[in-house]
Amino acid sequence: MFRISRLGWVWVGCLAVLTIIGCLRSEITIAADGGLFSMGLIWCAILLGMILSMRRSPLRAFAVPLECLAQLIAVSVICAVLQYPAAKIARPLIDAELAAIDRALYFDWPACFAWVLRHPMVLNLLSGIYLSLGLQSALSCFGAWRQPDRASIWLSANALSLTCCLTVFVIWPAGGAFAYYQPAGIFSDYLEQFVAVRSGSLTTLAIGQMKGIIQFPSYHAAAAVLLGYAFASLPRWIAIPAFNIEIMLSISAAPIGGHHCGGSGFLDSGIS
């Protein structure tokens, strides 16, 4: 556990340095507001709890889950910031190519999206599951009580997946299906930020306002595979429902997240 964990922290440190360099080069600043202060305070409290738990025998069982949670928060926030300098590189978009892959696979994104809109129950279900990624990730850290090595492997794989998503995003950026098909009456706040940062008009970021602007590949689809692995070691009455939720999380990436289906699906499986 601890060897893999140390590797994860080294990776987090490298990503943090890369984020600082990226923000300086792209002239993007992070607003020192209440959101940043609160996030830092929560993270420090978790880290302090981990240290205290390691020093007291009755509380030692809490140390590993708290370390996993601290590492998860660190890599998530750092990569959330890093996506903005990555987007500002502004290479040509590949949405037309991704849409062509969808057509070759006989996947009609506008028809799929319209069908989901016509079925409110499906829309609410997929939206809820799509938005549950953060909560699911946090809960998976507490699986470290049962199998600490498995939790540490999932965290390291998660950090690597985020890094791969960022790398692909820099080389082959995409605005996503919402930008390409422009469905009537649909407003996407992630798309507004994506366009703003590529044009250079977005130069200040607040932690509470950051969105997931990476549309290719889909991190949600990749995370569904990793979370399935994380929950697989738990009792069957937890693992089986969790497995079904991860399937729906992967499905929700297209109609809820606005991701192109074909290209993202194959690449995400490879990344995971």
What are these regions (language model features)?
Residues 28-31, 121, 210, 252-261:
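Membrane-interface helix caps and helix-loop-helix hairpins in membrane proteins
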Residues 40-55:
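Central hydrophobic cores of alpha-helical transmembrane segments in multi-pass inner-membrane proteins
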Residues 15-24, 76, 162-170, 244-255:
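Aromatic-anchored segments of alpha-helical transmembrane domains
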Residues 2-42, 62-139:
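N-terminal transmembrane-helix/juxtamembrane module of multi-pass inner/ER membrane proteins
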Residues 139-146, 221-239, 269-272:
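Membrane-interfacial alpha-helical segments at the cytosolic side of multi-pass membrane proteins
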